[in-house]
Amino acid sequence: MPLTEFCYIPSVATDAFYTPEEQAIHNRLVKLYTLRMREKDGQNRKWRVSSINRVIKKHKDELVELLRKSLEDNITRELNPDAVTDKTIINLFCSELTRSLGIKTFERSDKIIIVNVFFFEVLNSIIHNGFNYNGEHYIFYSCGAGMIRTKRFMAVREKDYLAVEQTLMCGLTIDSINALGGMNENKLLSYKSLMASATDRIEDFDIDRCIVVDDFEMPVMAESDFIDYTDYSITRKTSETIIAETDGWGMCCKPGFKTQIVRAPWIKGLVSYFDFRGWLKEYCPADDWTVIDIYGKEWKILEDDIQYILTKSMFKLHKFYPSWLCYKSNFKSYGCYFGCCKVEEDYIPKARINYQMLQSLSDMTDNEIERLIAKTADEIDSIGRDYQTTMRLLGATEYNQTKSAMQEALTIYPELFKDVYNRELLKQTKKSLVKQAKGGRLRINGKYLFISPDPVAFCEWLFKGEQFPTGILENGEVYTNQFKDGDELDCLRSPHLYQEHAVRINKRNELTDK
């Protein structure tokens, strides 16, 4: 499964690429930082700290000037081999990128190097000229949204990248993208990083059984907050808003398929299980068993044996391919794969709410707060006393599919929880739960679930051509088999981005369960 298999790669900072002159200044700066820290921890004389700061600023200015000169000289930097040590080796989860490059699970490899950016002059140089390490040339590969936030990027050994470039980009090149009008650089980097997402290959995925159709959009009449950007006043109005119901969502009718987040070259999103072929046979005449893809080609769902229907919003670079057939041809020719990031498991444990969601409940009373924290307080008090709570916190449960040897032993002989090791583990767990509770992570009767649009409404729009389909859910209703029919559910997005708490009624019956 994803996040269980990884490889080992170097992670270095931009100071590992300094020239000898730049390194000399850097070494002096390190000594000055140490001297300043000792002074602050010792006598903390302000005049001495100020004096050290002035010298630090002078050396920083000298270093920046040298970096700028090196950038103007357009040099190709060298990675200092001494900077790659056991301490700088990190874990990188296995992905389609690592598999394409031939990096084996738990293998130490130099084919990929992570660079932490502190000086943008070095970053600029590497982006344009790459760098050399142990006689090999490396080039800038990509950095996703998470890497941009933490000022990191991924570099790949050039000869290895060129061998798999067409596989990673499914036949496209930077030149071919620019020839068709180009695109936003940050978006391109994010989409290239899809291949570095921690995934497992979906070995039985057949691209010939897959199509891409337009997204289902529908006007919705609802209350919205309008912000006046002149004075930032907020006015709540009831108005009509166009909502992309199927944004980043697709469906699969393959028996045994589990709802999962998928990745492929230029494709990302959630694919849910829905037997649309069975629905077609039951609710539509044979004339409606056809669909038009985003390129205008007609597909016969049953005759063409279509099992996956993806939407346009999932296919990020669709405009750079002349047809879906072209993408499929490249996909097969260059040995591309679909990968799975996360699968919705059969057993879904209860979740903990977080401080963001609690902060948006600004009018809670003391009694409501006490009710909200009751389960967390009971859980903490019952550690070591209640059998089920103790076993659950130690991981010795039936639904834990990756038990350690100790957890297996606890399952056979529960009294082992009195062992010194387990008692210490429970003690640290209790401390952690208390700390989490103080930070707003409270145990509640809730679960983290994938959310998808009404697939029946989507099929009514896609196959029947209904512009305002009714589906099987009314306004204010949701469906999940994790709660009872009629339960009032607070549907919250994680991370929580706004004040709203979408309270909905769970609708469960024979039709929705089907």
Predicted regions and their residues:
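Conserved small-residue
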Residues: M1-K514
